Regions:
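Charged, low-complexity interaction regions
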Residues: 16-27, 42-45, 62-74, 92
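Short amphipathic alpha-helical heptad-repeat segments
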Residues: 1-14, 26-30, 42-59
Length: 95
């Protein structure tokens, strides 16, 4: 399955963020979703590629322990987690 099929779901999540109050956390979520969307639009990118990209982004050392994490980084992590949730949702509907 091509990752492009997830772009409408990612856009829906971004629209929901537009309705929320602006702040560092929302900005971090938006940044993560934009990055995931840009990865999904690449030619030949599969859902597995997108999942791997999100998981690699979550593993990076820039993420601190929960108590030391600032709002932007927390939102960034939550954004990638939201994309992973969309991937799971699409895959379970497909089966």
């Amino acid at each position: 399955m091509l990752a492009r099929q997830l772009i409408p779901a990612i856009r829906d999540e971004l629209k929901k963020l537009d309705a929320e109050p602006r702040g560092a956390r929302a900005s971090g979520r938006r940044a993560a979703m934009w990055r995931a969307q840009q990865h999904a639009v690449r030619r030949g990118s599969t859902v597995d590629d997108l999942r791997r990209y999100c998981l690699q982004s979550l593993r990076r050392r820039r993420f601190l322990e929960a108590e030391d994490e600032n709002d932007y980084l927390r939102g960034y992590r939550e954004g990638f987690q939201a994309v992973l949730s969309q991937i799971r949702r699409v895959e379970t509907q497909r089966v």
